């Protein structure tokens, strides 16, 4: 069996629409498989010496407050050390798991204007990710 794996920064329209359906389903846990850029690259072209991981870390330390503000909790975060089973062309750098009361809580968090301010560090640091919803 071959599985196509494609890291992305943002969900596509079909994924967004699916997430909006049954927004009260929950609790949900989001498993994030993260791949960082070698060097952070900000959309506003600011000069930086940060690695992608360092830029993402600026986002990560702040996003925990937003997860909690919307009734969720940060469950786990860690660096990937190796692949135990299976094969992928390029291994992810880190894994993070966050739990939300429901889809709506996560969506509300992402729409928060204060959250949007820290999102620039996420985008600057991430080469791509897989974000897997579990119920």
Q: For each predicted feature, which ranges?
A:
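Short, Lys/Arg-rich amphipathic alpha-helical interaction segments
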Residues: 97-135
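Short S/T/G/P-rich N-terminal loop/turn motif that feeds into the first structured element of a domain
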Residues: 1-94, 101, 105, 135
């Amino acid at each position: 069996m071959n599985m196509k794996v494609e890291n992305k920064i943002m969900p596509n329209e079909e994924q967004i629409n699916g997430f909006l359906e049954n927004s009260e389903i929950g609790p949900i846990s989001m498993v994030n498989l993260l791949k960082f850029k070698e060097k952070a690259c900000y959309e506003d072209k600011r000069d930086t010496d940060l690695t992608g991981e360092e830029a993402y870390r600026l986002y990560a330390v702040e996003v925990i407050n937003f997860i909690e503000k919307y009734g969720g909790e940060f469950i786990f975060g860690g660096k990937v050390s190796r692949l135990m089973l299976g094969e992928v062309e390029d291994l992810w750098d880190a894994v993070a798991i966050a739990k939300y009361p429901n889809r709506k809580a996560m969506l509300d968090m992402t729409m928060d204007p204060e959250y949007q301010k820290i999102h620039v560090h996420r985008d600057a640091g991430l080469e791509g990710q897989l974000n897997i919803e579990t119920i």
